C-alpha cells in the first residue's frame, strides 16, 4: 500500500473530529482562511444510492468510509488542504456497457478514493457590502483505478473564486471556477467545465444550524468520464462539547449523480503551532 494511504488512515484514526468554522456537510468551500497554526480536521461517512460509473458500466449503492480532510492555516493569507476517502465500496446492482472492464468476481468492488491537494489564498476580507473573497487551486490525483471500476485514472485540476457574506446571523457561501479534466477515452483530449456552488448556513439555536446547497459542474454534453454533475444537500450542524456533528440528505440532479443519500460526519479544530514573532533588529 502506498505510503500516503497509511498517512491518511492514521490521520482519520488519530485526529478527533469537528469545529465551528468548517462547513461540513456542505461541499461549497468557505472563503475564510484559518488563522496561522490552526488545524481543522473532519471525518465522515456517506451512503449513496444508485451511483453510476460510465467507464465501467457499474451501478449500485455506494458507501464511502472515511471521507476525510485536513486544513492548515499556514499564514495570514494562505491555507493548505488535503482530502481523500479511505475506502469506497460499491454494492453492484446493474452492469451496463463498459469502456474499461472492471476486474471483480462478485457483486462488490472497492478502492481508495482520489487524493486532493489544495491551496486557498485570501484576496480581501468581508467589509460593508463587500463579501470576503478567496482564490483556491486544487489537484486531484488518480488513486482509484480502472480495475475496481471506480476510477478514471486521470489527474484533474480545479481553480475557483470563493465568496462569503453574512446577512444578519446567516452566512451565504458561493464559488465559481473551472476544472481541467483529461479524457479517459480520448488521448490528448480534455474537458473544461464550469464549477459552481451556492450554500446557506442559518442558525436556529445557539448550537444548531440549518444548512443547504446546490453544487456541481457543467460542461459540454456526452463526454464519457467527464459527465456533468450536480447535487443538492440539506441538513443540520450541531455542537456537543466543542465537537461539531453534521447530518444531511443528498439528492442527485443528473444521470451520473446518486439518486439519493445520507452523509454524517464531524469536525474538530485546534491550535497546532504558534506563529513565530519576527525578530526586531535595533541599530
What do these predicted ranges mean?
Residues 1-8:
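Bacterial N-terminal signal peptides that target proteins for export
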Residues 21-283:
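Transmembrane beta-barrel domains of Gram-negative outer membranes and organellar outer membranes
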Amino acid at each position: 500500500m502506498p505510503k500516503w494511504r497509511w498517512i491518511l488512515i492514521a490521520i482519520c484514526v488519530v485526529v478527533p473530529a469537528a469545529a465551528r468554522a468548517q462547513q461540513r456537510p456542505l461541499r461549497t468551500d468557505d472563503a475564510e482562511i484559518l488563522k496561522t497554526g490552526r488545524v481543522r480536521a473532519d471525518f465522515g461517512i456517506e451512503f449513496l444510492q444508485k451511483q453510476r460509473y460510465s467507464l465501467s458500466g457499474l451501478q449500485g449503492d455506494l458507501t464511502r468510509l472515511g471521507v476525510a480532510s485536513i486544513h492548515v492555516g499556514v499564514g495570514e493569507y494562505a491555507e493548505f488542504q488535503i482530502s481523500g476517502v479511505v475506502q469506497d465500496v460499491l454494492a453492484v446492482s446493474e452492469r451496463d456497457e463498459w469502456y474499461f472492464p472492471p476486474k471483480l468476481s462478485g457483486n462488490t468492488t472497492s478502492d481508495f478514493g482520489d487524493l486532493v491537494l489544495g491551496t486557498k489564498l485570501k484576496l480581501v476580507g468581508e467589509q460593508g457590502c463587500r463579501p470576503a473573497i478567496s482564490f483556491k487551486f486544487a489537484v486531484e490525483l488518480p488513486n482509484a483505478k480502472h480495475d475496481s471500476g471506480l476510477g478514471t485514472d486521470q489527474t484533474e485540476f480545479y481553480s475557483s473564486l470563493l465568496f462569503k457574506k453574512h446577512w444578519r446571523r446567516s452566512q451565504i457561501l458561493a464559488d465559481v471556477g473551472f476544472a481541467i479534466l483529461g479524457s479517459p477515452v480520448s488521448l490528448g483530449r480534455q474537458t473544461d467545465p464550469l464549477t459552481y456552488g451556492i450554500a446557506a448556513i442559518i442558525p436556529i439555536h445557539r448550537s444548531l444550524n440549518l444548512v443547504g446547497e446546490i453544487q456541481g459542474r457543467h460542461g459540454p454534453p456526452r463526454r464519457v468520464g467527464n459527465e456533468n454533475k450536480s447535487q443538492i444537500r440539506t441538513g443540520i450542524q450541531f455542537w456537543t462539547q466543542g465537537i461539531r456533528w453534521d447530518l444531511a440528505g443528498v439528492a442527485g440532479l443528473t444521470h451520473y449523480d446518486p439518486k439519493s443519500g445520507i452523509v454524517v460526519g464531524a469536525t474538530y479544530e485546534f491550535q497546532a503551532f504558534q506563529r513565530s514573532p519576527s525578530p526586531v533588529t535595533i541599530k
